[in-house]
Structure formats: C-alpha cells, structure tokens
C-alpha cells in the first residue's frame, strides 16, 4: 500500500519545446523519458516549457542538470517557461539536459527525506 501511494504522489508532467510536446508522463523512468531534440527546434527562438501537476503536499523545486549531474538551473516552482536562447547558453557544449522535480516535505521539522523525480532527459544536438 505504501508503494502505490508513493506513486500517486508523483503527479504528471509535460516537457514542451517550441510548442511541440517532447515528453509527457506520470512515472519517473530515466530509461523511457528520453527524447532527442531536433537541431532546428533547439536553434529556434522559442521556449522550453515544463509543466508539472503535483499530487500531494510538498515543496517543489524544478532543477535542470547536464549529463554529468552538474546543476545548471534551479527554481522553486512546479512549472517554468524558459527562453531557448537562455537555455542554449547554459547548456553550450553539453550533450544532455536532465530535468528533475525535487519534492521536499512541507514542514522542515518533519525530517522526511526529499524525493527526486526524473521528469525527462533531452538529448541536445
């Protein structure tokens, strides 16, 4: 029973590049939630749009890392719309962008561990 309630706490998400849905899911899976971005989409003047619909009572942190796990961007929110020109500068020379949602307990005094959900990996051109 604990396992199923833990899965429900994940919520659902969408990762959109230039109004094109790249990844949509509700189960964190680093092997399945992977998409290669076309060079034309990556070089355009559009947006990276990340939308997370939460389940449960947590504090949420959206995090972008490179392929080696180095944090490139982080914000306390469940959704973000970022200019691709800004993201291209952050990820210049990188091969992948990994997108995570960090779920922290709503009360710091709870001493519960944070959960990290892999929302998706974008393979960059």
Which residues does each predicted region cover?
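Bacterial N-terminal signal peptides
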Residues: 1-4
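Terminal leader/tail segments of proteins
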Residues: 7-125
């Amino acid at each position: 029973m604990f396992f199923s309630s833990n899965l429900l706490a994940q919520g659902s998400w969408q990762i959109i590049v230039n109004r094109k849905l790249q990844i949509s899911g509700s189960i964190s899976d680093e092997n399945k939630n992977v998409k290669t971005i076309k060079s034309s989409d990556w070089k355009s003047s559009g947006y990276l749009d990340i939308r997370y619909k939460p389940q449960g009572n947590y504090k949420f942190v959206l995090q972008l890392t490179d392929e080696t796990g180095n944090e490139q961007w982080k914000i306390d929110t469940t959704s973000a719309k970022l200019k691709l020109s800004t993201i291209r500068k952050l990820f210049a020379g990188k091969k992948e962008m990994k997108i995570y949602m960090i779920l922290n307990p709503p009360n710091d005094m709870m001493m519960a561990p944070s959960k990290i959900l892999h929302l998706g990996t974008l393979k960059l051109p």
